[in-house]
Amino acid sequence: MEQNELKILAQNLANPQGEKGIEIGEMMNETNLGMTLESIKALSVEDGNHILEIGHGNGRHVENLLARAENLRYIGIDISETMHIEAEKNNTKFQDKAEFVLYEGEILPFEDKTFDKIFTVNTVYFWKNPVNFLNGIYRILKDNGTFVLTFGQRNFMEKLPFTPYNFKLYNNDEMEQLISESHFKRMKISEKEEEIKSKTGEEFIKRKYTVLTINK
């Protein structure tokens, strides 16, 4: 890929827009599905839970989540208007259980202690003020709630050709340090590895990633 194409890819991974964004959203759903399902598993969803996902993409995984327990209520938020529209389109049959909210990326527009479970996959690289954002998540999570944060490890991510463009990368120690600066203190680290098709579409690669299960 040419440098300009890599920049466009990086921009659309952060905030998918238009027809290219829809294409990237489909690709992200496919390549991130393993990480997403591991994150959902780590949530240990229970009947009646109110769940928030930060950065829902095209939302094709929501059906899987809603099937895991009874009377779940899911809200997904995203900065991408394109993904917001696609997620609503892909989940019309779950309108009574799933809601999608467009937001500006920094202030989480919810009341204190709203959610039992919160999760996010591959978004932390784009947070402008990570500690403030973590504290915002802490604020809207109920006492004894669970927050799952999943990210590609630095030593894997830095080999990808598009991550030099506006990606902030972390290894496990750096992420632990970041979280320790927030109100969150209790966490469990689980390292994973999977083989996926690269986002440039040119090869299959082994991705190393971390699922952090953080309790309030």
Segments from the language model and where they lie:
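Conserved alpha-helix/loop element of class I SAM-dependent methyltransferases that forms part
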Residues: 30-47
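Class I SAM-dependent methyltransferase SAM/SAH-binding core
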Residues: 50-107
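A short acidic, Gly/Pro-enriched loop at the edge of an enzyme's catalytic core
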Residues: 106-117
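A short SAM/SAH-binding and catalytic strip from SAM-dependent methyltransferases
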Residues: 117-130
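A short glycine-rich, Lys/Arg-flanked "PGG" loop and its adjoining helix->strand segment in the class I
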Residues: 131-143
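Conserved beta-strand signature within the Rossmann-like core of class I S-adenosyl-L-methionine
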Residues: 145-151
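Acceptor-substrate binding/catalytic loop of class I
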Residues: 158-174
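Core SAM-dependent methyltransferase catalytic element
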Residues: 195-216
